[in-house]
Amino acid sequence: MASTLPIPDINVIAPSFIQRDSQNSDNMKPPPTDFNHPYTPYPIQTAFMQTLYSVLDRTVAVSPPTTTNSTNNTAPSATFSSTAATLIPSNPSTSPSTPPLINPTTAPTVHLADRATEPSLSVTPRTTTSKDKDKGPSSSSSVPKGHAQIALFESPTGTGKSLSLICGSLTWLRNHKRLQFDSEIEKIQQQMEASGEPEWMVESAIKRKREELAQKYEEMERTLERIRQKEREMEKEGEEGQARGGKRRKLDRGKGDEEKGGKKKESGGSRGLTASDEDKEFLIGDWRDEGGLDENDPMGQLSKETRELLEKVGMGTAGGKKEANEGPVAEEEIKIFYTSRTHSQLTQFIQELRRPEFPASVPTPNPQEKPAKEIVKQIPLSSRQKLCINPTVNKLGTLAAINERCQSLQQPKTPKDQRCPYLPNAANLKATHEFRDTALATLPDIEDLYQTGKQLQICPYYASRAAIPGAEVITLPYPLLLQKSAREALGIRLEGNIVIIDEAHNIMDAVSNVHAAEIKYTDLKRAKLSLGMYYQRFHQKLTGENKVMVAQLQRVVEALGVYLKTKLDKAALGLKADQEGIVLDTSLLLKTGGADQINLYKLIRYVQESKLAFKIEGYISYCEEEGRDTDDEEAETEIKARQGRPPVLHTLCSFLTALTNLSSEGRIFYEKIPPPRGELQDMKLSYMLLSPTHAFSSIAESARAVILAGGTMSPFEDYKAHLFPDVPPEKITTLSCGHVIPPDNLCVWTLGSIAPNPKVDTGIGEDCFDFTFAKRSNPNMINRLGLVLLNLCSVVPDGVVAFFPSYGYLEEVIGVWKTHEQAMGPKTIWERLESKKALFIDSKTESSEQTLQKYSDVIHSEVRPLSPAGSRVKGAMLLSVIGGKMSEGINFSDRLGRCVVVVGMPYPNPHSPEWLARREYLEANFIKRYTASQQTSTATAPLPAPVIPPPSNTTHYSTNPSSSRNKDKHKPANVRKLAARDSHQFYENATLRAVNQSIGRAIRHQNDYAAIVLIDNRFEKEHVRAKLPGWIREGWDETQRQAKEDGKALKGLQGMMGRVNMFFRGKN
């Protein structure tokens, strides 16, 4: 029987969840109890950090209690099977299907995987030839087996999630480094003792080795400390403005850049050109010259001298030379790659990273000395759009244009005096090293990095790579991590490293979005005109092969344009099938002019390597600035109309790239789109990734651990089924934390009808709230909804935020409320609401920042504002949209969000082509995997879960196909039914995640309080509530318990108002 190692009691009794094999206890160490947290952590934070530590350390662990509300804090007994290397709970039948929950007053429940086996991380790269490039990617659809340990963490906002991630992961990393150090010393000691050397020689050798290992570390720390001291002195003297903890610097990237950077010759100017100069600037050269790009070499566009220098200073690709790197910070060790959705979230994370202090990676030579502290070495990575300091390049605006221009300035054929002066070179090598050391010494964010680059006159985008080998934490936005090509361009290798994805509730959509592409008919018209103008000017000077390739691109543009024009003409006739749909046969897209015979892989490679898009866009821009006349009236119109629009050929190239990467996981759609004011109707083609599985597999297969964390991650099943379908269940850990607020700070109510016992009519109770797509437009129900909000506004102080399924439906609801109904009295619902609170609407067309500011000003105003009728109102109500601008990234803490109301569930349109295509894919994939699992004695991959919607009286159910009650479900017809249910579950889960994100806008810290009201009869179904965050479910249970004790009605408007009124009375 395994021995139990309990978690220390911190204000609560927490069960043990880490167990060691008594026969091999030396190799199985429990997580520490001290995580260098800047303040005494909550018990849930301790459990979070210990779980994270164990995942990274691959510690063997078991599943503790399966119920979250039990008062019994004793851990269940477990047995360890050394043969199978798995831990078996004493009662496996009670294992929950929903993620475990931790809260401050109940026992933590953790599912930890077996950590006994260390996977192999070796990767054998495939050599790609130029012929391979022209043929395109392999058609193999198999997903590589994942090596990473996987952990899914849910921790509500305000519970210290960021600090828990920081302290848990960096404590493990520093301990890991110290163990490596000790291992080296122990190795020397064993070698010396085995050789029979005298004890004094053994001690001397160990001392020399210890000093040798510590020397490089000490040199680096001294260098970084000198930089930090210099930074402190500069801040004190006011040379850097306000101190680091103060207001962020606002960077002027406009004319000021040109003035501040004026001491260097700016590259890229090309106005007032002669015909000869135009040829040099815009004419395509021989794209197969030695300067041509290798798509597997992200630095292939740079000159030979530049590549050699970047590799020398550690800024080459992952496989580049590093042994020549100067300075003490070149060796690469295990790193933590942290990513989040926005740069502001990354900045907030870096601010949190500055708070804790961690022990040094190398122990002090004298055991009596106080352990040394070591600053965390972090480097933020970003795109050229955020980091470029060359004013002639960053003024281009769009990322594609900036990338093309930057690469163009570094081509081998570009004269040296026209290359970017900020790129690292032999002349500014000292500045490059100073940039690297400054970055590692100061925990910078993106704005700090940009400012440092400007001060040192060195490119932050390239110079930041020099800091990667010495960094412990690398922060970067979603696109740079999720796209394999972006990682390769930055020289990032995930093999053996730790990946932490924060705000991961939308990670599946994020993966799909970074691989999406679209192009409009108007874009194709612009591309055709641009190509025509360019060809007319330069066709006599183009080489034969260049003429062929440009002509091929023209044919492709013409074919795509004809396809969309045909659809647009049919759509004008009112045919519904031609308004939107799926392109079932993609060969039809290029049918015109024989474009379907063109090798698109080769054409795209040509466009990328020849810089054709940049040269054409540059020439059109030049004609615009010069006011040059053309013989083509349409071309003149194109020149005038292109201002402020993204470069069309970059858009085209992105779409063609998606077109060549078609697989079973992607589809092409066409859709008629509403035109901007004053313009003609338009039609677009779009590529959508139906599943993120294959695109995400390159991360899951290589990292040491992949951590998905968020405030509202529930339900968890989809992450397992669609991101990690081939990862064994024992390698996946899930943890759901409760909130830090006391139970009486939260009131949760589900309102399915306005009456306690709704009357029943034909299919729907006449008092029920049914916001399904087919029934939500019922004006009587919309008015009943208005009455509910009117009652809430009467008792809720300060701010009320109501979320609706869509902007369109919000407009519809407001329209009904503004319509006078005789039965509702002399005033409309809208007028009555205005008499209670100031009303604000989240609109697609208005700035969310301005709306939020006005809403906040009213709530915090000392003088109660006047309503349109002249009466004084108390507080304000904001009408917003689930998944809209106000539902994510904005905090309605304290008075701004005393009540959050969710109206309906934002299911997508069930008849949209995108939904139909994804449903078809999910069901086909389910059947394929289900069939494969039945054809072998052991399933080749875990089935997506959940499979069958649970019964109404339970949240836990079995998906075991061998169950006697499911004998007939292997029949094809029944399997199809299971597949349909599975696809429905996917969309229900996605819908609930969006709802959960909106709910999470309230309750932002320990002392905050709010009421949460969910209005729709579907919220009263237990299997729907089971997909809400654990702390919301517990809040609902507590509210129901209190209502019973008070003897109030348990359902309907009366029951809700009684409970909500009582809740806020207790807060006054």
Swiss-Prot record:
The keyword Metal-binding applies. A motif (DEAH box) lies at residues 502-505. Residues 31-556 form the Helicase ATP-binding domain. GO terms for molecular function: ATP binding; ATP hydrolysis activity; DNA binding; DNA helicase activity; iron-sulfur cluster binding; metal ion binding. Its cofactor is [4Fe-4S] cluster. Residues 119-128, 953-964 have a biased composition (Polar residues). Its main location: nucleus. Residues 228-242, 253-268 have a biased composition (Basic and acidic residues). It catalyses: Couples ATP hydrolysis with the unwinding of duplex DNA at the replication fork by translocating in the 5'-3' direction. This creates two antiparallel DNA single strands (ssDNA). The leading ssDNA polymer is the template for DNA polymerase III holoenzyme which synthesizes a continuous strand; ATP + H2O = ADP + phosphate + H(+). Residues 943-952 have a biased composition (Pro residues). It is an enzyme of class 5 (isomerase). [4Fe-4S] cluster binds at residues 388, 406, 420, 459. Keywords: ATP-binding, Cell cycle, DNA-binding, Helicase, Hydrolase, Iron, Iron-sulfur, Isomerase, Metal-binding, Nucleotide-binding, Nucleus. It comes from the Eukaryota. SMART domains: DEXDc2, HELICc2. Its EC number is 5.6.2.3. GO terms for biological process: establishment of sister chromatid cohesion; nucleobase-containing compound metabolic process. NCBIfam families: rad3. PANTHER family: ATP-DEPENDENT DNA HELICASE DDX11-RELATED, DNA REPAIR DEAD HELICASE RAD3/XP-D SUBFAMILY MEMBER. This is ATP-dependent DNA helicase chl1. It comes from Neurospora crassa (strain ATCC 24698 / 74-OR23-1A / CBS 708.71 / DSM 1257 / FGSC 987).
